[in-house]
């Protein structure tokens, strides 16, 4: 009997055992509730019930914004992967390699060109899963390139910010992206095109000292953490207890730091409405057939799927 119990039964269990995916369930960070992953995915990564906004990948974010989930990937300039030959506990090049394998992205920012309710827009998305969405040379070049394309196409530029700050492994070369992106935003302003920022959870550090807080319209997702320094650092500096909800989206809206807090389900129509107001474009008529995908800068034909847009654009601000 012991042989049947201790040997045969476990072997049968192993043969019949069904493998369970690691991401089958998601635990809500707010309530601790376990939710089926597919339910969260189909709900734009908003936890049903608690309405907690989970992080979205760059591709999922772009799909949620562009018409027909179709856009052109904007070709981005190549940069030196490890200019300082930086190493801490691990080599910087190894960290980049792991982040690329994990996310499928070249760096923390992805830029797409497409249509939002019929109007052409350029959208840049920071992916927090790529080294905390940190801002390095590649990410800075991506933001600048997206702004240049918006100037060239004379259309709005929308950026979804999600970052822990500057990338320390690139030192001052990372910090240089703060003034470079600021100058590029000014180029868009001089072209009289809208610049819209959507602050997601979290948006902290150096990006809040540059392009993430320069929008003509500042929008945030509910509950997003937004700030330059951490709450504990501020409390230790001023030696005072911070109020409840400090650095959260709702607190910043109530104190005039941002314009709107918009639920993710309402984000696409809100962005389309803001773009129409700022560009004085007519509203798309619902009875019209589905809008076609945008024509890339140098190709008159319609795309069948996501493609790369040619990189021709004005010169970037000097490094």
UniProtKB/Swiss-Prot annotation:
SUPFAM superfamilies for this protein: ClpP/crotonase
Assembly notes: Acetyl-CoA carboxylase is a heterohexamer composed of biotin carboxyl carrier protein (AccB), biotin carboxylase (AccC) and two subunits each of ACCase subunit alpha (AccA) and ACCase subunit beta (AccD).
E.C. number(s) listed in UniProt: 2.1.3.15
The organism of origin for this protein: Nitrobacter winogradskyi (strain ATCC 25391 / DSM 10237 / CIP 104748 / NCIMB 11846 / Nb-255)
Name this polypeptide is given: Acetyl-coenzyme A carboxylase carboxyl transferase subunit beta
Domain CoA carboxyltransferase N-terminal, residue spans: 24-293
Function of the protein: Component of the acetyl coenzyme A carboxylase (ACC) complex. Biotin carboxylase (BC) catalyzes the carboxylation of biotin on its carrier protein (BCCP) and then the CO(2) group is transferred by the transcarboxylase to acetyl-CoA to form malonyl-CoA.
A biological process from GO: malonyl-CoA biosynthetic process
Highest taxon listed in the record's lineage: Bacteria
An annotated GO cellular component: acetate CoA-transferase complex
Subcellular location(s) of the protein: Cytoplasm
Keywords: ATP-binding, Cytoplasm, Fatty acid biosynthesis, Fatty acid metabolism, Lipid biosynthesis, Lipid metabolism, Nucleotide-binding, Transferase
Pathway linked to the protein: Lipid metabolism; malonyl-CoA biosynthesis; malonyl-CoA from acetyl-CoA: step 1/1
Pfam families on file: Carboxyl_trans (PF01039)
One term of GO molecular function: ATP binding
Enzyme class: transferase
Reaction(s) the record says it catalyses: N(6)-carboxybiotinyl-L-lysyl-[protein] + acetyl-CoA = N(6)-biotinyl-L-lysyl-[protein] + malonyl-CoA
């Amino acid at each position: 009997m012991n042989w049947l119990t201790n040997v045969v039964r476990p072997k049968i269990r192993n043969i019949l055992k069904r493998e369970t995916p690691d991401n089958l369930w998601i635990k809500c960070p707010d309530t601790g509730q376990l939710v089926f992953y597919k339910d969260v995915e189909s709900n734009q990564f908003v936890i049903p019930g608690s309405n907690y906004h989970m992080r979205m990948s760059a591709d999922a974010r772009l799909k949620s914004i562009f018409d027909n989930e179709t856009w052109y990937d904007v070709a981005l300039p190549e940069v030196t992967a490890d200019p300082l030959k930086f190493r801490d506990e691990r080599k910087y090049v190894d960290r980049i390699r792991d982040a690329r394998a994990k996310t499928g992205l070249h760096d923390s920012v992805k830029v797409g060109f497409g249509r939002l309710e019929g109007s052409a827009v350029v959208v840049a998305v920071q992916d927090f899963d790529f080294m905390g969405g940190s801002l390095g040379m590649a990410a800075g070049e991506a933001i600048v390139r997206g702004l240049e394309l918006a100037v060239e196409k004379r259309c709005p530029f929308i950026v979804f910010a999600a970052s822990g700050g500057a990338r320390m492994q690139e030192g001052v070369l990372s910090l240089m992206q703060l003034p470079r992106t600021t100058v590029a935003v000014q180029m868009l302003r001089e072209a009289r095109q809208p610049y819209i920022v959507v602050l997601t959870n979290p948006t902290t550090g150096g990006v809040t000292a540059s392009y993430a807080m320069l929008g003509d319209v500042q929008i945030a997702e509910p509950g997003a953490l937004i700030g330059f320094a951490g709450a504990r650092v501020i409390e230790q500096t001023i030696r005072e207890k911070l109020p409840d909800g400090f650095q959260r989206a709702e607190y910043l809206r109530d104190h005039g730091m941002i314009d709107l807090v918009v639920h993710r389900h309402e984000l696409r129509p809100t962005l389309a409405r803001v773009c129409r107001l700022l560009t004085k474009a007519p509203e798309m008529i619902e009875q019209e057939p589905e809008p076609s995908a945008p024509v890339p800068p140098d190709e008159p034909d319609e795309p069948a799927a996501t493609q790369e847009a040619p990189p021709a654009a004005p010169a970037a601000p000097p490094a």
